[in-house]
C-alpha cells in the first residue's frame, strides 16, 4: 500500500525531528554528558522517545484512514512537545528551531481541537492475529470487571494488591505468558513471543497500572 500524502509528510517531519535530536545529543556529549547538563538530558530523553514512537506508528498509519489520522495526531503532538522544550534553549541544544518551520501546517492541522475531538473516541483497528485478539479481549474483560472496581480503593488507601486480583490473573494464565512452554508457560517462541504479555499488560493498565498492569511485568 502506498503512503498517503499526510503520512509522507509525517515521515518527513519525524525525520527532521530525529535529526534535531541527534544534533542535540552530540551537543550534550560535547558539553560533558548528562551529569553536566541534566536538564538537556531529561528533555532529550522525552523527545527522543516520542520521536521513535511516532516513527514506529508510520507502518500502522499506512493501513487506513483512521490509522493515518491517529499517526499524524501523535506526530503533531510530538513536534509540539519538541518545540516547547526547545524554544528558549536553542543554544543549549545546539539546534535551529527553524528546521521545523515547514511542519507548521501539518501541526496546525493535526493539533486542531475539532480534529482531536472527532478522533478522541475512535478505537483504531488493532490489526492483531486472531490469537492475540483473544488475549486482548480476555484481559480487557478481566480488567473491566475485576481490576477497575478495586483500583481507586487501593490507590487512595495505599493498600496491597487484593489477593483475588492475583489469583484471578493466575487462573487466566497471566503469569505464564512470557514463560516458554517447556517450563509450563504459554510462550512458543517466534517473532511474537512476548506480544501476548505486552497486550495483556496494556489492557490491565487501562484499569490500573498499579494493581493490574505492573503485576505481570514484575
Range-by-range predicted roles:
Residues 1-212, 216:
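Flavin-dependent oxidoreductase catalytic core characteristic
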